[in-house]
Amino acid sequence: MLVGSQSFSPGGPNGIIRSQSFAGFSGLQERRSRCNSFIENSSALKKPQAKLKKMHNLGHKNNNPPKEPQPKRVEEVYRALKNGLDEYLEVHQTELDKLTAQLKDMKRNSRLGVLYDLDKQIKTIERYMRRLEFHISKVDELYEAYCIQRRLQDGASKMKQAFATSPASKAARESLTEINRSFKEYTENMCTIEVELENLLGEFSIKMKGLAGFARLCPGDQYEIFMKYGRQRWKLKGKIEVNGKQSWDGEETVFLPLIVGFISIKVTELKGLATHILVGSVTCETKELFAARPQVVAVDINDLGTIKLNLEITWYPFDVEDMTASSGAGNKAAALQRRMSMYSQGTPETPTFKDHSFFRWLHPSPDKPRRLSVLSALQDTFFAKLHRSRSFSDLPSLRPSPKAVLELYSNLPDDIFENGKAAEEKMPLSLSFSDLPNGDCALTSHSTGSPSNSTNPEITITPAEFNLSSLASQNEGMDDTSSASSRNSLGEGQEPKSHLKEEDPEEPRKPASAPSEACRRQSSGAGAEHLFLENDVAEALLQESEEASELKPVELDTSEGNITKQLVKRLTSAEVPMATDRLLSEGSVGGESEGCRSFLDGSLEDAFNGLLLALEPHKEQYKEFQDLNQEVMNLDDILKCKPAVSRSRSSSLSLTVESALESFDFLNTSDFDEEEDGDEVCNVGGGADSVFSDTETEKHSYRSVHPEARGHLSEALTEDTGVGTSVAGSPLPLTTGNESLDITIVRHLQYCTQLVQQIVFSSKTPFVARSLLEKLSRQIQVMEKLAAVSDENIGNISSVVEAIPEFHKKLSLLSFWTKCCSPVGVYHSPADRVMKQLEASFARTVNKEYPGLADPVFRTLVSQILDRAEPLLSSSLSSEVVTVFQYYSYFTSHGVSDLESYLSQLARQVSMVQTLQSLRDEKLLQTMSDLAPSNLLAQQEVLRTLALLLTREDNEVSEAVTLYLAAASKNQHFREKALLYYCEALTKTNLQLQKAACLALKILEATESIKMLVTLCQSDTEEIRNVASETLLSLGEDGRLAYEQLDKFPRDCVKVGGRHGTEVATAF
């Protein structure tokens, strides 16, 4: 957030200085509006300092690569670095133009010495610009190599998913081992390139300009500033002089930029030898520091913005003390050469990245039509190797064929990637996979099938010139019994469809609801042309055959467009009948409210990110935080490593096909001809940094130049079949393959985030934090169970006892839960469904003892299971869900084994609450005086009602409750329960409940809550601040002392409070 802006002109050739400022990480969810200007102590006395000390001399330069690559962060830093280098070039080009113009004007009437100096300056700038250009080329080269390794890693990852969904076999296991090895190699290459790129980031020169504050800086105050950036440190001390100036023992330092890492700044006020008061601590983003001109920034040290640290930061593209090439330059070149060899059969050419990518474009003869060569490459490498080895063990060594071979294939009469508008011939394609389950087969118009002796996975491509009689000869070997059974199956109650409608690319597929279709049997006298599928002929669907154990060949028509789209369409449509039969056993959610389904749209990623962000600053504070972080990371790893088993076998099969084909989409660089003049190489994307970009702008520009281009395979899959990812190479969404389990994980991640926020807020009140940590410990156990379920029985658990084995000991609770959840969603149940089941099972019993209280009792129970501060409203029930782990954990923690008896106890609570709410004035006063503390249940609903009665405007009601709470507080058991509940209420987000809890704590004289009240005094809501301050002042000498210290150093009191677990990065 921009909190201050000013101009700074140190002089020199840089001219006007651009200035920005930042606020760092904010502890509050919403910052208060602040003034844009502040009082600055412009003149700061500097103590004499020795030669500038470089941080990397202390061991910063560590060539050990990181364990995990950070591709998103690398992309951000690369963009910022490129912008900074381009800006440097622009600045120096402007300076060069100015000096050149001066030189021309001075040549006639100037002395030789002046001309010599000016010419010397021009040559210096030119040399520097050439060095900048070379530096940019090195950065581009590394980033291009990084992009390739990233794409290869994504491809290997998706191949792992494809193999995980296929039947297990020895060849598959060997292939999976090889792919894992390749995945590890690509990951190590990415980490190595990150280290090499980090060495090209230059250095940041940071100058201390002093502190500024609104009446916070007094003469004699001493401050210590500690800056941390990765392994680099800078500590300096300063003092505020009598004349308002400042003296610091350090003036300037140098930090080497890091790809991963932020600058952490901590300011401490030194009161004495052992007294140090933390003024503030912030963490700052560094991307915007890559600028050609020095920047003066103002850092907000505290949340109120009353203390600011002024720094002047200058970025230099080169390490001024290390003008020579890095010691690892030879290793880097060797590594790049090794990586380049994977994409070229011969000696790799030196890439320039400004004009073309790693891959050479093919140049067919002008009289031949432009064709894509990826199919030819696949035919010569992928298919051939697959046929020979029957496995994918050598996939990492796949690479495009030599140019001569590719041109041979590209000159075929028809290319299967064309739309077929001008094609007059059709190319029959026969594909067979024997390792697909269920013995699925496809019957063509002649019931073509693979020979009985063909048992290995095989993909064959038959060109148009191929003699069709060879195909007919294959049909003679097919078993007559199999043909007869196929014909009989077609005749039993199944009607053929005359035409399969084209699906809308934007409409999601619903394989479970589509009707079953049969293969249409053509007459045996049909000609050879019937081997091809026409638009008016029903598409052949995959059908289960008891006798067949392999997939019969599928004839595909090249005139219908992309082979991949046809293949996916056939495979997915063939699985429609099985999807209906498997729906119940797969465990996919059906028939639940829309509120439940809304959690499936990208919520798993959001829930993981929210919890990890809340844990990150505080995970070392408690052992429970560390355990939770470990379990959450373990669950996240399981979901990332597991294949995305979708809602049915149909989409799972589509994912397998798509993953295998799109993994290496980036290798599909079309071999289009040169431009019209034939002299230039086709440059797609228009820049060094756009070779592997998938942005919409580049996609449209690519297609506008080449309208016949089909784009990425994954994009075509999405448009024509409705399955697959929307952007090529994008990561698949996290999912367990079971919607009910997904919703359950999201709910518990969100609840853990809420608990972490409350624990951080109450960290200075041990008994409150201890109670909340107990709840968090139970959630850690839940996370462990969720990870086990997701890892071992992904999406296939149909019994609650399998998820929670201890459930069989509580049969009444288990019986009720099975009535609440649907057969296909055992992990959760909508809250309104739980309410309806409670009414159906227990409404008569509750109303018999407490007439008319059944509905509030049930809503109270559901609210307590969800750990809500107040009963749920009827309107919000439809959007809430109860998970089986919440249900079981609640009753276990309360020692409940019989639901009916527990509802009777809860009804007593609700009855007393309604009694207190309905009484007024004298009746309430009389009732409260008659109640003894031992007779009043110290339960959540009763305590909440008593506190809310204190907020009424009626003084007599408030007085009655005050007298009762004061008397009840003498009972130790009641006071402990009330104190814990009201302190926990302070951590809730309900403002009315926070206000009521403050008033109740005031009556209880709860000095134990002072630290939490001090935190609440910094609330954004004025009403809450006033009530908390009044309560604080009423708590005797300790409360008054805490309130007085609040004005002196608020950050020391609220450095944890007010931070609800989320921090926002703020750029310079």
From Swiss-Prot:
Effect upon mutating residue 523 to A: Reduces phosphorylation, interaction with HDAC6, YWHAB and 14-3-3 proteins, localization at the front of the neutrophil upon chemokine stimulation and prevents T cell proliferation inhibition
Residue ranges, compositional bias (Basic and acidic residues): 494-510
Coiled-coil region: 83-112, 768-793
UniProt-annotated stretches for the region Involved in cell filopodia formation: 55-113
Induction per the UniProt record: Up-regulated during fetal mononuclear myoblast differentiation. Up-regulated during cytotrophoblast differentiation. Up-regulated during granulocyte differentiation. Isoform 1 and isoform 2 are down-regulated in T lymphocytes upon T-cell antigen receptor (TCR) stimulation. Isoform 1 and isoform 2 are up-regulated by FOXO1.
Annotated InterPro entries: ARM-like (IPR011989), ARM-type_fold (IPR016024), FAM65_N (IPR031780), RIPOR3 (IPR026136)
Any one GO biological process: cell adhesion
GO cellular component, one term: stereocilium membrane
Expression by tissue: Expressed in primary fetal mononuclear myoblast. Expressed strongly in naive T lymphocytes. Expressed weakly in activated T lymphocytes (at protein level). Expressed in blood cells and adult tissues of hematopoietic origin, such as the secondary lymphoid organs. Expressed in cytotrophoblast.
First-listed, main subcellular location of the protein, grouped into a coarse class: cytoplasm
Modified sites of kind Phosphoserine: 21, 37, 341, 523, 573, 585
Record key words, sorted: Cell adhesion, Cell membrane, Cell projection, Chemotaxis, Coiled coil, Cytoplasm, Cytoskeleton, Deafness, Developmental protein, Differentiation, Disease variant, Hearing, Membrane, Myogenesis, Non-syndromic deafness, Phosphoprotein, Signal transduction inhibitor
Region (Disordered): 45-73, 474-524
Domain of life: Eukaryota
Compositional bias (Polar residues): 474-491
Biased composition (Basic residues): 48-59
Post-translational modification summary for this protein: Phosphorylated. Isoform 2 is phosphorylated in T cells. Chemokine-induced phosphorylation of isoform 2 in neutrophils occurs in a PKC- and AKT-dependent manner, resulting in RIPOR2 interaction with YWHAB and stabilization. Isoform 2 is phosphorylated by PKCA, AKT1 and MAPKAPK1A; in vitro.
Pfam families hit by this protein: PL48 (PF15903)
Protein localization: Cytoplasm; Cytoplasm, Cytoskeleton; Cell projection, Filopodium; Cell projection, Stereocilium
Annotated function: Acts as an inhibitor of the small GTPase RHOA and plays several roles in the regulation of myoblast and hair cell differentiation, lymphocyte T proliferation and neutrophil polarization. Inhibits chemokine-induced T lymphocyte responses, such as cell adhesion, polarization and migration. Involved also in the regulation of neutrophil polarization, chemotaxis and adhesion. Required for normal development of inner and outer hair cell stereocilia within the cochlea of the inner ear. Plays a role for maintaining the structural organization of the basal domain of stereocilia.
Additional record remark: Cells lacking isoform 2 exhibit a severe reduction of myotube formation. In contrast, isoform 2 overexpression induces formation of filopodia.
Family from the record: Belongs to the RIPOR family.
Summary of subunit composition and partner proteins: Homooligomer; homooligomerization is regulated by RHOC and leads to the formation of concatemers through the association of N- and C-termini. Interacts with 14-3-3 proteins; these interactions occur during myogenic cell differentiation. Interacts with HDAC6; this interaction occurs during early myogenic differentiation and prevents HDAC6 to deacetylate tubulin. Interacts with DYSF; this interaction occurs during early myogenic differentiation. Interacts with MYOF. Interacts with RHOC.
Disease as annotated in the protein's UniProt record: Deafness, autosomal recessive, 104: A form of non-syndromic sensorineural hearing loss. Sensorineural deafness results from damage to the neural receptors of the inner ear, the nerve pathways to the brain, or the area of the brain that receives sound information. Deafness, autosomal dominant, 21: A form of non-syndromic sensorineural hearing loss. Sensorineural deafness results from damage to the neural receptors of the inner ear, the nerve pathways to the brain, or the area of the brain that receives sound information. DFNA21 is an autosomal dominant, progressive form with incomplete penetrance. Age at onset ranges from infancy to late adulthood.
Protein name: Rho family-interacting cell polarization regulator 2
Gene: RIPOR2
